[in-house]
C-alpha cells in the first residue's frame, strides 16, 4: 500500500474515530475463560474463528434443530440506570433458551451480540459473565458473538444486547400442542419477578410515581425486585420430559398469560385460568397500585408470577406436581383445558 497521507494534516486512526481495537481484543481475552467453562463436548473449536463449529450430539434418530433469537428489551435501560450489569446476561440467555424448551428442544449453543457507542471493557465483561452463568444454568455452550463499537449510534457506553440459540429435539418428541385435549391440566411454574418483559411500562410507573428504588417491596429493595434475573427452566423441564408426556408448554413473556398460552393451543381449545390459584407476587402488586394499572392490562403485559405453563393430561397432573416439587420447583395447578365455543377468547381468566 502506498502512503498517501499528507504531511500537512494529522494522521487519523480508527481510535480517533471512536473505535478502540485494543479494547475489543482485551474483551475477547476476558471472554475466553467464560466460554471455556460452558463448553460442551460437541464444541469443535475455541473462540476467535470466523465461525463456531459444533458437532451434532449422538443418540438421535431424526434430530431436528430449533433456533431462537431475543433480547431483554428496556430492562437494559434500568440496568444502565442502576449500573447493574452482572445479571442482564442471564436474562438474555433465559429469553432464548426458555423459548426453545417450549418445543421440547435441549439448548446446544449460544451466541451474543453486544453493540455500544463506546466500549467499556469492564461493563461488557460483566455482561458476558452473566451470559456465561446463564449458559451454565441452561447446559449450553457460549461459542461466540459479536462486539460492535459504533460511535454516534449509541450514547456513550450505553449498549444493546441480542442473543441467538440453537437446540435439538428428536422429531418424534417435538412438543407443539397438537395433543392438547379437553380436561388437560395446566400447571404453573413461578417467575422470579417481571423477568424481561413489561419494562417500558415499569419505567413509566417509576417515572410518574417518583418511586424510591430503595423502598422495601416484599422484603427486598425495589431495585433488586425489578432486576431479579429471568428464571431458566431448561434442566427441570428436560428431566420432566423423560418422566411423562408433556403436551404443551408456554413461556410467559410479553403479552402475559392472555397472549402466550393461545400460541400453543389447538383452534378448538381454550385455557381456563384460576387467578386465585397462585400468590400474586409483591412486586406486581406494587406496580399495579403505583401505576393504577387495570387487571386486564396487568395480565396482558406481565407474567404476574407465572413464568412457564405446562399442559399435561389430568391423569399425569399429580405425578408432574410431585416430580417438579422434588426437583426444587414450587408448581401449582392454575387451570384446565375446556372446549372453545364460537366467539370465545382462548384464555379465560377467572378472578373470583
Swiss-Prot record:
Taxonomic source organism: Teredinibacter turnerae (strain ATCC 39867 / T7901)
GO cellular component, one term: cytosol
Catalytic activity: 2-formamido-N(1)-(5-O-phospho-beta-D-ribosyl)acetamidine + ATP = 5-amino-1-(5-phospho-beta-D-ribosyl)imidazole + ADP + phosphate + H(+)
GO biological process: 'de novo' IMP biosynthetic process; adenine biosynthetic process
Main location (coarse class): cytoplasm
Alphabetical keyword list: ATP-binding, Cytoplasm, Ligase, Nucleotide-binding, Purine biosynthesis
Compartments, as annotated in UniProt: Cytoplasm
Pathway: Purine metabolism; IMP biosynthesis via de novo pathway; 5-amino-1-(5-phospho-D-ribosyl)imidazole from N(2)-formyl-N(1)-(5-phospho-D-ribosyl)glycinamide: step 2/2
Pfam family, one: AIRS
Entry keyword annotation includes Cytoplasm: yes
Lineage per the UniProt record: Bacteria, Pseudomonadati, Pseudomonadota, Gammaproteobacteria, Cellvibrionales
Record protein name field: Phosphoribosylformylglycinamidine cyclo-ligase
